[in-house]
Amino acid sequence: MLIRILAFLLETFFFVLIGAALLRAWMNGCRVNMRAQPGSFVMAVTDWLVKPLRRVLPKAWAQSRIDGASVVAAALLAIIYALVWALLFGVLAGTADLTAFGPTALLPLLAFAVKMLVRVALQTAMILVFGFAILSWVQPGSPAYSLLGRLTEPLLAPLRRVIPTIGGVDLSALALILILQIALMVLG
């Protein structure tokens, strides 16, 4: 039971960090004001890694429309998560051989990191769309609704072209949540 609690805490910690880095890239891509909430929170959580990466990465890539430094930060965090997870739970299970950490162990770790990165991206998108859908019913005039609308519009616009409104209700958010959930099920 202690191992499950430790796994949950480790995954939650890295989920927040990776999600914040991906959200920072998405918010920059959507030209959202980063000085307001949740932008200031996202910047506070990710500045320690994104700012040094901006100095190291080529300027054209690090500060492009999609914030490359934030995407690289999310990828690095996913790799660190995979390494920590493999070492920690391999040692606790008694299966870790720290001397045999070579190229053969690298591919499964990278696959694990990519899976974590994709899962966090899908779940973050689902949270944004779910929040947007709820606010569209409860408080459509709020600043949070406007922010979530800007963040989810690139995801919802293609579906709105295909799915008609029924009785004045836009079902594109529901369809996207279903698509994201299916993608998470396929991811495993």
Predicted regions and their residues:
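Selective transmembrane helix interface/packing segments
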Residues: 1-188
